[in-house]
Swiss-Prot record:
The protein, known as: DNA gyrase subunit B
Origin: domain of life: Bacteria
Coiled coil start-end: none
Cell location: Cytoplasm
Protein family: Belongs to the type II topoisomerase GyrB family.
Domain Toprim: 416-530
Organism for this UniProt entry: Helicobacter pylori (strain J99 / ATCC 700824) (Campylobacter pylori J99)
Catalytic activity as recorded in UniProt: ATP-dependent breakage, passage and rejoining of double-stranded DNA
Enzyme class: isomerase
GO molecular function terms noted in the UniProt entry: ATP binding; DNA binding; DNA topoisomerase type II (double strand cut, ATP-hydrolyzing) activity; metal ion binding
Known cofactor(s): Mg(2+); Mn(2+); Ca(2+)
Its job: A type II topoisomerase that negatively supercoils closed circular double-stranded (ds) DNA in an ATP-dependent manner to modulate DNA topology and maintain chromosomes in an underwound state. Negative supercoiling favors strand separation, and DNA replication, transcription, recombination and repair, all of which involve strand separation. Also able to catalyze the interconversion of other topological isomers of dsDNA rings, including catenanes and knotted rings. Type II topoisomerases break and join 2 DNA strands simultaneously in an ATP-dependent manner.
Length: 773
């Protein structure tokens, strides 16, 4: 075993500024920074694994709000540091830039200067507990806000002399961090990634609050990574290979396959850090791959079609490239792009040699890959011809713009905005209602093409898409230039119904797949047209949704109610809680039937703790009191099933754990408890929901409430005042928070594969709270 003692810890001082400027060290003090703290501690353990001294990492999110990271590595050194004269582990936890990562003999490869990380985590934690198992002893030390509050002390002996490792438990400091609640979903993705990239490393993750427990372990990690990343059927087997360059101490590992897909999905990593912007290693990979495949096509396939180029080779490619190197050079602070020049040549040569060998030894698979590239080249040429029809001249004259476009007078992109409007009738209202100086209108006829299911050559033949590209002025694909964008706000404006939502989704898919920089730079918005218009006498109010309508009715209805024993503000707040309670009950009724039984279960104290037979008796008495006819009833220890004839017809009711664990049931129960915090004596035993309805009816009396199905129902002035006027309107800016997750959702929901989409809908249908049919 490599000797890992205090002299391996190199020190660069200065922890004072971390709490003052945490963003400089962890990116931000929000969700991203919080989880970065976890990664820094876990990365230390993974570095031990890459050095060959650790094969198990356990991460636990505790109910108390802490994160525990435990590894079975060598354990941080506990002997006295030669220059600091305190235990080396204390140095690592309290001095910035102290760590074995600065010593090439200790860690041949590392994700970076992780000695920075663990001390920063300590500085940003209100409490941190370090436990070390080393040389038969168990050591422990506690810190608060980066400062030791105890000496390093021996608290026991290990079960065996060989047992070793480090455990760090930290509680994020809410006085520095804006967010201190960890999100399991974010962490799961990263830990799974780490397990893929490190064969034989077992990462166990547990969240005590939800009892979530998962273990990630892969023997052929990169091959599994490629398999799991495939959104469509693989056309080839997964090709995997690895190599070690002794001169530069660089390990290269690659896995790739081709799928029946138009999109490329290449992921690259350096020392387990995702290089989302690529770099020299990714460039070398694509260079070697293209060279091998193009050479094979030139030597083995005679064709009169266009010769493929590198871009064609990437169509349908799924690949993972992982490098582990001793001194990576990254471009920028984020380490998202590798700059080490020698990596390009190393990776390119390895990939060329291995792919060349594979193609020679596997003629059937070679033919599949070659034909896919040839088809991509053919489609590219067709796309090029179609693109010429949509390509914008240097200075767009009015004559070249789409005929349906009602352009604005301003030529300043910063103040100009374009509305993509569903249908000609709504387009007509929008054209009449707009501010012609800076607002342009482009009506879209029907539903645009689903670009997820179509090749670019077909996409660019779509009249609606051609009109959009021409109007925007920024081009598409290789001709894309965001500097030529004619409008800095592109606003999707559709009806507030199912078709409108579908058109929004189709447009978002198009922007995401082919004009993603417009989303990334904040140019794409969705207009929030009102769903309701309330008119009473000369009063006209527009309300964006049913929640806004209900709140409006409550606020105006209580003015007509003469109530003693509660103030108007308290009454208003109470009724808004009651309104939410009613909403959750009605949603539950859609799933389980018998609203009266649901209310009984929620509102009867200790009902959920009753024996099922006792519960059955109480429920039957309740229903019989309502003159419902019980046709069948059957109870076991864990469930109750009954059929009843009600005024609404024959209904079935099932009572079991599915109901009790339903998120909506829990929400309804919680909301009812909130209601009970109010003094309800003023109701004089009147039902709170009946009273809510009474208040709403006062506001509805003599009023006309119109629900808009389409923008075309609104006159130009209404549309201007509610949806287009800068002072009044509400816009949603499109953002991409997680590129991979977004990509997966678009592929799943908009792609060709029916079964995965059906499974997704079935899994999430119960979580839909509003469904417009």
């Amino acid at each position: 075993m490599q000797n890992y003692q205090s002299h391996s810890i190199k020190v660069l001082k200065g922890l004072e500024g971390v709490r003052k400027r945490p963003g400089m060290y962890i990116g931000d003090t929000n969700v991203g920074g919080l989880h970065h703290m976890v990664y820094e501690v876990v990365d230390n353990a993974v570095d031990e694994s890459m050095a060959g001294f650790c094969d198990t990492i356990n991460i636990t999110l505790t109910e108390e709000g802490s994160c525990i990271v435990e590894d079975n590595g060598r354990g941080i050194p506990v002997d006295i540091h030669p220059t600091e004269k305190i235990p080396a582990c204390t140095v690592v936890l309290t001095i910035l830039h102290a760590g074995g990562k600065f010593d090439n003999d200790t860690y041949k490869v590392s994700g970076g200067l992780h000695g920075v990380g663990v001390s920063v985590v300590n500085a940003l934690s209100k409490r941190l507990i370090m436990t070390i198992k080393k040389e038969g002893q168990i050591y422990r030390q506690e810190f608060e806000k980066g400062i030791p509050i105890s000496e390093l002390e021996i608290i026991g002996k290990t079960k065996s002399a060989k047992e070793s490792g480090t455990t760090i438990e930290f509680f994020p400091d809410e006085s520095v961090m804006e967010v201190v609640e960890f999100q399991a979903g974010i962490l799961q993705k990263r830990f799974k990634e780490m397990a893929y990239l490190n064969d034989g490393l077992k990462i166990s993750f547990k969240e005590e609050k939800t009892q979530l427990q998962e273990t990630y372990f892969y023997k052929d990690g990169l091959k599994q990574f490629v398999k799991d990343s495939a959104k469509k059927e693989l056309l080839t087997p997964i090709i995997a290979f690895k190599s070690m360059d002794e001169e530069t101490r660089t390990s290269i590992e690659v896995a790739l396959a081709y799928a029946d897909d138009y999109n490329e999905n290449t992921l690259s990593f350096v020392n387990n850090i995702k290089t989302s912007e690529g770099g020299t290693h990714e460039a070398g990979f694509k260079m070697g791959l293209s060279k091998a495949i193009l050479q094979y096509i030139d030597n083995n396939i005679k064709t009169k079609e266009s010769r493929p180029i590198s871009e064609d080779i990437k169509e349908g490619l799924i690949a993972v490239v992982s490098l582990k190197m001793s001194e990576p050079l990254f471009e920028g602070q984020t380490k998202s792009k590798l700059g080490s020049s020698y990596a390009r040549a190393l990776v390119s040569k390895l990939v060329y040699d291995k792919i060349h060998q594979f193609l020679e030894e596997n003629p059937n698979e070679a033919k599949i890959i070659a034909n896919k590239a040839l088809l991509a080249a053919k489609a590219r040429e067709a796309s090029k011809k179609a693109r010429e029809l949509t390509r914008k001249k240097d200075n767009l004259s009015v004559g070249t713009l789409p005929g349906k476009l009602a352009d604005c007078q301003s030529k300043d992109p910063l103040e100009s905005e374009i509305f993509l409007v569903e249908g000609d009738s709504a387009g007509g209202s929008a054209k009449q209602g707009r501010d012609r100086v800076f607002q342009a209108i482009l009506p879209l006829k029907g539903k645009i093409l689903n670009v997820e299911k179509s090749h670019l050559s077909k996409i660019l033949k779509s009249e609606e898409i051609k009109n959009m590209i021409t109007a925007f002025g920024c081009g598409i694909q290789e001709s894309f230039d965001i500097e030529r964008l004619r409008y800095h706000k592109i606003i999707i404006m559709t009806d507030a119904d199912v078709d409108g939502s579908h058109i929004q989704t189709l447009l978002m898919t198009f922007f995401y797949r082919y004009l993603r920089p417009l989303i990334e730079q904040g140019h794409v918005f969705i207009a929030q047209a009102p769903l309701y218009k309330y008119k009473k006498g000369k009063t006209e109010i527009y309300l964006k949704d049913s929640v806004a309508l209900d709140h409006f009715l409550i606020e105006h209805g209580i003015n007509s109610v003469d109530i003693e024993g509660i103030g108007k503000n308290d009454l208003m707040n109470l009724l808004k809680v009651a309104r939410h309670y009613r909403y959750t009950l009605l949603e539950l009724e859609k799933r389980y039937n018998l609203l009266e039984v649901l209310r009984f279960l929620i509102e009867t104290k200790d009902a959920l703790s009753l024996d099922m037979k006792v519960l059955e008796k109480s429920i039957l008495e309740k229903l019989e009191g309502l003159n419902y006819q019980i046709l069948r009833s059957f109870a076991t220890e864990e469930s109750l099933h009954l059929h009843a004839q009600t005024p609404k017809g024959l209904v079935e009711f099932n009572l079991d754990d599915n109901l009790f664990k339903d998120v909506l049931f829990e929400e309804a129960h919680y909301t009812y408890q909130k209601l009970m915090e109010y003094n309800l004596d003023f109701l004089e035993n009147k039902d709170i929901l009946a009273f809510l309805e009474e208040v709403e009816n006062y506001a509805k009396k003599g009023a006309n409430i119109q629900r808009y199905k389409g923008l075309g129902e609104m006159n130009p002035n209404d549309l201007w005042e509610t949806t287009m006027h800068k002072e009044n309107r509400s816009l949603i800016k499109l953002k991409i928070e997680d590129l991979e997750k977004t990509d997966a959702v678009f592929s799943l929901c908009m792609g060709d594969e029916v079964e995965p989409r059906r499974a997704f809908i079935q899994a999430h249908a119960k979580d839909v709270k509003q469904l417009d049919v």
